[in-house]
Amino acid sequence: MSATQNYGTGRRKTATARVFLRPGTGKISINNRGLDQFFGRETARMVVRQPLELTETVEKFDIFVTVVGGGVSGQAGAIRHGITRALIEYDETLRSSLRKAGYVTRDAREVERKKVGLRKARKRPQYSKR
């Protein structure tokens, strides 16, 4: 492994992303596929690029990502979190601007479990008075 790469782990919902930043031209590879090929949804692509656009490092790094678990939104959020952590490892001065944008904090919201006697986590069966 080269010493010129930075690593960050990102998590969101049940998705986990391992992100490697290497000096390059701005190519983003997710599970050996391009960003546009991996995410069909434009909002997901936008979420992934957010920390790079904020720190103006879009064409400074090649990014290699391995992501597992979750759905489209969770994976995009996990990749964003991982890129943020890798950028902080690369340059600690970026932390304040990334924190202000809210990218450093791990979004801890998880799916609430279904309870016995209820239809879903909180949805109750219809109440009948008589």
Swiss-Prot record:
Molecular function as annotated in GO: RNA binding; structural constituent of ribosome
GO cellular component: cytosolic small ribosomal subunit
Keywords of this entry: Ribonucleoprotein, Ribosomal protein
GO biological-process terms attached to the record: translation
Pfam family, one: Ribosomal_S9
Family statement drawn from the similarity comment of this UniProt entry: Belongs to the universal ribosomal protein uS9 family.
PANTHER family named among the record's database cross-references: RIBOSOMAL PROTEIN S9, SMALL RIBOSOMAL SUBUNIT PROTEIN US9M
Protein name: Small ribosomal subunit protein uS9
